[in-house]
């Protein structure tokens, strides 16, 4: 069993590396040369205050990877298959409990594929804003598709007599839109008060209180998400950079989160399962003003260009 779990963990790690590599890609022109994102112009509005650090154009490679690659689909299918197999074993081994068993899942980029929202931003030359996202949550349920493997996993959860609890940072104000998306995708939700936990405030991103609420109602045996904060806040939430933070601060905070992820190794592939998301997440709060300085060093040097022979 340890060998199986260890191999599952290694496969998942490979998926996350693939996702990270995709996130490093920049738009590629017809000549194949990399181009940086264009500066804001009258036609291209400046980034909103609540927008992520990377501009949309710098995320293009990651979005293309998520929307078009078979590798991403294979990753998600593999992770959900591993989670289903592990849950089957947990249920078989689990002693009787007064509280019903539950699996806690995030929604966006864990169950819901929101590629349509990303496409909307690109086609309209827009950056992310909370207001645009709220409109998408509320009014565009039919644009939402499924993350590969999610529906089959949820069906297995029900088959095993376990309750899937959806814990998301979508707005409670837009609950009807989220329920409509779930219905559109054919995902069963019982009593929303017991199985769908959304955030009340637009500024609330910490899930700890809601996780504790769920733990009071259920015997939670598994968590699934696409962001480390879907598993624990204290260890994985990125700290806010102090004013004037330099490269050293960003490197230290990145290493802290990486170390915490390594410390949680006994959870990965056992009761915590994470899906790749190279488009957005806690990680992109720490890219700093010079992302290239955070990348692995290299000993390679560009070849010298020899002058043309006359």
What are these language model-derived features?
Residues 2-12:
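Bacterial N-terminal signal peptides that target proteins for export
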Residues 10-24:
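Bacterial N-terminal signal peptides
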Residues 23-105, 287-310:
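Non-catalytic pre-domain segments flanking phosphatase-related domains
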Residues 65-74, 138-144, 165-171, 200-201:
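Second-shell loop/turn segments in exported
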Residues 103-113:
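Asp-based phosphoryl-transfer active-site loop
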Residues 109, 150-182, 226:
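Substrate-recognition element of Asp-dependent hydrolases with the DxDx(T/V) motif
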Residues 126-138:
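Conserved phosphoryl-transfer catalytic core
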Residues 171, 175-310:
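C-terminal cap/substrate-recognition subdomain and adjoining C-terminal extension
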């Amino acid at each position: 069993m340890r060998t199986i779990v260890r191999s599952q963990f290694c496969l998942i790690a490979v998926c996350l590396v693939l996702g990270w590599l995709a996130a490093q890609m920049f738009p590629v022109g017809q000549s194949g040369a990399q181009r940086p994102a264009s500066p804001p112009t009258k036609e291209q509005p400046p980034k909103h205050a609540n927008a992520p650090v990377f501009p949309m154009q710098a995320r293009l490679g990651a979005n293309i990877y998520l929307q078009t690659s078979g590798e991403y689909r294979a990753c998600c299918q593999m992770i959900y298959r591993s989670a289903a197999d592990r849950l089957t074993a947990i249920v078989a081994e689990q002693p009787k409990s007064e509280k019903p068993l539950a699996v806690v899942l995030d929604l966006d980029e864990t169950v819901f594929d929101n590629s349509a929202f990303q496409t909307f931003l690109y086609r309209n030359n827009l950056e992310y804003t909370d207001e645009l996202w709220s409109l998408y949550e509320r009014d565009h349920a039919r644009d939402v598709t499924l993350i590969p493997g999610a529906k089959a996993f949820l069906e297995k959860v029900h088959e095993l007599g376990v309750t899937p609890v959806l814990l998301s940072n979508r707005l409670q104000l837009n609950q009807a839109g989220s329920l409509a998306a779930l219905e559109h995708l054919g995902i069963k939700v019982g009593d929303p008060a017991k199985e769908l936990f959304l955030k009340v405030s637009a500024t609330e991103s910490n899930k700890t209180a809601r996780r504790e609420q769920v733990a009071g109602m259920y015997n939670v045996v598994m968590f699934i998400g696409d962001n480390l904060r879907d598993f624990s806040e204290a260890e994985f939430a990125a700290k806010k950079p102090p004013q004037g933070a330099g490269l050293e601060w960003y490197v230290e905070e990145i290493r802290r989160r990486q170390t915490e992820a390594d410390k949680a190794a006994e959870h990965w592939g056992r009761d915590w399962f994470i899906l790749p998301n190279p488009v957005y997440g806690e990680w992109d709060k720490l890219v700093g003003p010079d992302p290239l300085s955070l990348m692995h060093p290299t000993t390679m040097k560009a070849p010298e260009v020899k002058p043309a022979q006359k």
